Curated annotation (Swiss-Prot):
Protein name: Elongation factor Tu
Family stated for the protein in its record: Belongs to the TRAFAC class translation factor GTPase superfamily. Classic translation factor GTPase family. EF-Tu/EF-1A subfamily.
Source organism of this protein record: Kocuria rhizophila (strain ATCC 9341 / DSM 348 / NBRC 103217 / DC2201)
Region annotation (G1) ranges: 19-26
UniProt subunit comment: Monomer.
């Protein structure tokens, strides 16, 4: 019986519930768990509301987040589902990338329509690159007037379009999480319909191995008679031996060829995402490369110094700063394997940022880093983390 849990013969996706406080995110999560456990009992185990709501505290890079993880399967897919009960938890989770989502269910109470946090969550989802949103119009059993439901649906679609999602075509499913939990047949079906919409509409994620190769350099050393070796953990892609690569970041871009690949002291024909490996680089000296650069497929990533970011600043209790900072604050930005100093400019109208706040900012680094939108980083002072963020837009 239990064996079915570990059969990974279905595509795996990470999804989550987002939306305004008390619109029913956690109740919907519990309802999905129950409905699927009833429908496919062999592969699903029901998790009740209490277990999800009392989400354990997790530490991600020193930031405390309450977040619940549950898993379930439909006929087509295996899902890992994250539910962050509190608004602050959700914001931290999105910005720190504690749980990357392939798609999200935006929960909007039909009784209220979109509220302040609904907007903020959708904006954040776009900024951190959640690829797909669909909508659960929850508490639909409490609205008798069909026209009112249509109106709320229109409002939600408009909000999605405003934030750069496909509001016209996003599925909007009318559900009642509470009634589904109580076993009311009409509303159980609504949750089944919702999961069918998730199955059909959230695209399969691009597997890491299918992306262009990238390995952050952690260490550099010389093997006498053979040349310079860089080591690190391949972040994505595959790299066959004798491929051309670029070394990007910190210094001008260099081109070279990988003439040897080693893992656990064995010679390999290719390096793959997720593996720790050593790459032998043709014609480069020990001093030509350093920690903090990346080895990548030529042309796949470029070095940049100026960017916009969305950042969460740790509270004092989380070990962060004790006092606010202002524009021109110069901390270290830790990208992948190295710290680079950067100058912060706060947005117009933001005088200062307090510990525990989340904010947008513009950053100018003193050295270029291999960068793309969505890349995560930590903000550090003297080696301790005081914030965590993501690149939302590259300026130069």
């Amino acid at each position: 019986m239990a064996k079915a849990k570990f059969e990974r013969n279905k595509p795996h996706l990470n999804i989550g519930t987002i939306g305004h406080v008390d619109h029913g995110k956690t109740t919907l999560t519990a309802a999905i768990s129950k409905v699927l456990a009833d429908k496919y009992p062999d592969v699903n185990e029901q998790r009740d509301f209490g277990a999800i709501d009392s989400a354990p505290e997790e530490k991600q890079r020193g930031i405390t987040i309450n977040i619940a993880h549950i898993e379930y399967q439909t006929d087509k897919r295996h899902y890992a589902h994250v539910d962050a009960p509190g608004h602050a938890d959700y914001v931290k989770n999105m910005i720190t990338g504690a749980a990357q989502m392939d798609g999200a269910i935006l929960v909007v109470a039909a009784t209220d329509g979109p509220m302040a946090q609904t907007r903020e969550h959708v904006l954040l989802a776009r900024q951190v690159g959640v690829p797909y949103l669909l909508v659960a119009l929850n508490k639909s059993d409490m609205v008798d007037d069909e026209e009112l439901l249509d109106l709320v649906e229109m409002e939600v679609r408009e909000l999605l379009s405003d934030q750069g999602f496909d509001g016209d075509n996003a599925p909007v499913v009318r559900v009642s999480a509470l009634k589904a939990l109580e076993g009311d047949a009409q509303w159980v079906k609504s949750v089944e319909d919702l999961m069918e919409a998730v199955d059909e509409n959230v695209p399969d994620p691009v597997r890491d191995t299918d992306k262009p190769f990238l390995m952050p350099i952690e260490d550099v050393f010389t093997i006498t008679g053979r040349g310079t070796v860089v080591t690190g953990r391949a972040e994505r892609g595959t790299l066959p031996i004798n491929s051309e690569v670029e070394i990007v970041g910190i210094r001008p871009v260099q081109k070279t060829t990988v003439t040897g690949i080693e893992m656990f002291h064995k010679q390999m024909d290719e390096a793959m995402a997720g593996e720790n490996c050593g790459l032998l680089l043709r014609g480069l000296k020990r001093d030509d490369v350093e920690r903090g650069q990346v080895v990548c497929k030529p042309g796949s990533i470029t070095p940049h110094t100026d960017f916009e970011a969305n950042v969460y600043i740790l509270s004092k209790e989380e070990g962060g700063r004790h006092n606010p900072f202002y524009s021109n604050y110069r901390p270290q930005f830790y990208f992948r394997t190295t710290d680079v100093t950067g100058v912060i400019t706060l947005p117009e109208g933001t005088e200062m940022v307090m510990p525990g706040d989340n904010t947008e900012m513009t950053v100018e680094l003193i050295q270029p880093i291999a960068m793309e939108e969505g890349l995560g980083f930590a903000i550090r002072e003297g080696g301790r983390t005081v914030g965590s963020g993501r690149v939302t837009k590259i300026i130069k």
